[in-house]
Each structure stands twice: as structure tokens, then as C-alpha cells.
Design a protein with these regions (language model features):
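Bacterial N-terminal signal peptides that target proteins for export
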Residues: 1-10
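N-terminal leader/targeting segments and the immediate start of mature chains
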Residues: 15-62, 70-76
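Flexible, processing/modification-adjacent segments and terminal tails
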Residues: 26-34, 40-46, 61, 89, ...
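One face of beta-strands
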Residues: 47, 51-53, 67, 81-83, ...
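Generic short beta-strand segments
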Residues: 51-56, 86, 157-161, 218
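Mid-chain, structured segments of secreted extracytoplasmic proteins
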Residues: 67-108
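Short amphipathic beta-strand and strand-loop transition segments with alternating hydrophobic
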Residues: 69-72, 141-147, 201-203
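Gly/Pro-enriched, hydrophobic low-complexity segments
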Residues: 128-129, 151-232
Length: 232
């Protein structure tokens, strides 16, 4: 599975920049254009994959949850991603419905777990994170180019309106120029300190294609680590 296909499943955007011209690779591009291109990406096909969420708490206790992740096209400009815990008994379901040019629509079952800022399956990955809510904020600025994991990236800074109460005060994303994938991101709290740190891990090359085996989110405040592992 390519990076682009994998990121579709996890962060709803198929490499985050599907169809973004490579002409963007040279100059420092406009941040709003970059964010819009990410938000408007649509997967080319339906995708179903088995996964597991492994949470390592501060006390070293580990919690593992089996998941099914499905991305389904609803039209040319709309799709839905569903995350389901396994087994079916006491199953929890999270859904993100996305349409080009519109805000995301979220749903959870049971409904008492409908807070999009609460971690999925007890992890540090929230539904808002998977929905890339920070890319809908009004301030989007590309601040520099920087290498991350030996890859040249555009660093995108996203900030919310000051009058809106958000969990994060800003987010820095490292967007790989070649694949168009967000390969790392720092989430800052209201005091300007790094609250969470995301990174793509487990990159392997199979049959000439890059395959992503794992995503990691570290909660620096809680001292926990969440790993989303893909079972191909």
C-alpha cells in the first residue's frame, strides 16, 4: 500500500495532497492553498483494512484494541471513514463524513462518546485529529522548508480564531513534498507548549512502493504513547 493510500484511511486525505501539482515543490507555497488542497482530496476507491491500536500508559501498562477502518466513497466529492472496534460485543463506532468545500460531519456510537476531542479506543488519536480539524482554522501559513526523516517538507502552521475555544493553540505539520503526506505534526496547548507529537513510523518498501505500517501519537502531558498498526 502506498503512503498516499494509507493516509487516506487514517487522515481522510489520500496522501493529503492528491492532485497537488509538483510545481509546488520549489517555492514556499501559500499556506491556505496547501490546506485547501489537503482538505479537498478525495480517495480514488473504497478501502477496508484491519488495524490495532496499542496504547502504552505512563505506568507502562499496555492496552490493545483491534479495529476495522473503512473508507467509502459517497460521490465524486464526498466520502466517509468509519472506525470500528472488535469484537462486535460492546463495539464502538466513530465516523467522519467529508465533502469538498464543507465542514466535516462526525458521529459516534454509543452517542455518549460523541466528544470529537476524546481519544479513539483510549488512545491519544482523537476524531478531530483524524478529521484534520486544524486545517479548517482561519490561519494557515507555510513558514519554512525543512527536512524531516531525511525528506524535504513544507512546514505548515495552523492557528484557530482567538475567540474560539480549541484544545490546541496551533499545529505545525511537516508535509512531504514528494508524496504530499503529513509525516509529522506537533500540537500545541493554550500555553504554547507541545501537547502531542505525531509521526509516521514503520516505513518499508515493498514491490517498489512505500508502505506505512504504523502511526504514532505521543501525549507529552500524560506521558503516554499510542501506536496505530496496520495489518496487511
Amino acid at each position: 500500500m502506498k503512503i498516499k493510500q494509507f493516509i487516506y484511511i487514517l487522515f481522510l486525505t489520500a496522501g493529503f495532497l492528491v492532485g497537488l501539482p509538483y510545481a509546488y515543490a520549489s517555492p514556499l507555497i501559500n499556506g491556505e492553498d496547501l490546506a485547501v488542497s489537503i482538505r479537498n482530496a478525495i480517495p480514488p476507491e473504497n478501502i477496508l483494512i484491519e488495524a490495532s491500536m496499542e496504547v502504552t500508559q505512563k505506568n507502562r501498562k499496555r492496552i490493545q484494541t483491534a479495529l476495522t477502518i473503512e473508507t467509502k466513497l459517497l460521490g465524486q466529492d464526498e466520502f466517509m471513514t468509519t472506525y470500528k472496534t472488535k469484537p462486535e460485543s460492546n463495539r464502538m463506532v466513530w465516523q467522519i463524513r467529508r465533502k469538498v468545500g464543507m465542514q466535516n460531519a462526525y458521529s459516534c456510537k454509543p452517542e455518549e462518546n460523541s466528544n470529537i476531542h476524546v481519544g479513539i479506543a483510549g488512545s491519544s488519536f482523537t476524531l478531530a485529529d483524524f478529521g484534520l480539524e486544524f486545517l479548517h482554522w482561519p490561519s494557515q501559513k507555510t513558514i519554512k522548508k525543512q527536512r524531516r526523516k531525511s525528506r524535504l517538507c513544507n512546514v505548515l502552521e495552523s492557528k484557530p480564531m482567538k475567540s474560539i475555544k480549541e484544545k490546541y493553540s496551533r499545529v505545525l505539520s511537516w508535509v512531504d513534498e514528494k508524496s504530499g503526506a503529513i509525516i509529522a505534526a506537533d500540537f500545541f496547548d493554550i500555553n504554547g507548549e507541545i501537547l502531542k507529537r505525531f509521526t509516521v513510523k514503520g516505513l518499508t518498501k515493498k514491490n517498489g512502493q512505500w508502505q506505512v505500517d504504523e502511526l504514532e501519537m505521543r501525549d507529552l502531558n500524560e506521558g503516554s504513547k499510542s501506536r496505530l498498526k496496520l495489518n496487511y
